[in-house]
């Protein structure tokens, strides 16, 4: 599906960029691709990636999605875009909400506008469960990013560029996530700091995240949102699973919730469940393509949203201790950390 095509990955030196490049290299997909462009701000990470991958088809572009000219330059001749650039640390965005706005909203608008002007065929926008019923600056900014993408899709139904959104749950062992924190605390013989023991989070692997984006790329229509069905765990069970894997006697210390944290996350709202299509491992939420002339739609009717339940980390499949251990042991990151323990 990428034969002789040029791909652009914004925020390409991050967890998703590394994971999707690893997939393309491992499965020899890259031999059919014309070019992959990595667009990001950090020249050191780009240099490290360039040396590690050493592939002439992977090109590097220094720039910032906040700067329209830099993303527009990188977009010339691009066929497909994976938009992963974001500020994603919840407490940081609570203290610096304007920075979240500048990157996650205005930066996303720059990407979407450049893609439209440069006649990119398809854009996959990476979002988060925190965009559903958001209570923090990061989630609010991502929710508005989704709204920008869907609005572009609604206005461009007949245009060349297709816009789709993917929503992630917690991506295990991604940069800034809790698993690397717990492992570092175990190795340094420190207490494992847990915010709230009964707090639940969806558990996705980086492999799952790539699967979701590629599924949306292959099957997504204009304005679709895709969600992968994922199991969940409490934070306490996750910490105890890592204790067991690393044979750790570290104490667990409860420190209370951080700024902007939710007790559980939602991947699909009850309003969205009214129109969601169950695709087995995924939900597809089609765009509401109506215009502002509502009178002509009144005869259609609608499911009673009040009777539907949103899809959350509280009502999805809850993993027990042994199941979480098994899931963690399948992660390359955990295997590497075990070797170095």
Curated annotation (Swiss-Prot):
GO terms for molecular function: UDP-glucose 4-epimerase activity. It catalyses: UDP-alpha-D-glucose = UDP-alpha-D-galactose. Its EC number is 5.1.3.2. It is an enzyme of class 5 (isomerase). It holds the Pfam family Polysacc_synt_2. Keywords: Isomerase, Lipopolysaccharide biosynthesis. InterPro entries: CapD_C, NAD(P)-bd_dom_sf, Polysac_CapD-like, Polysaccharide_Synthase-Rel. GO terms for biological process: lipopolysaccharide biosynthetic process. It comes from the Bacteria. The keyword Isomerase applies. Gene3D superfamilies: NAD(P)-binding Rossmann-like Domain. Belongs to the polysaccharide synthase family. Epimerizes UDP-galactose to UDP-glucose. This is UDP-glucose 4-epimerase. It comes from Rickettsia bellii (strain RML369-C). The lineage of its organism: Bacteria, Pseudomonadati, Pseudomonadota, Alphaproteobacteria, Rickettsiales.
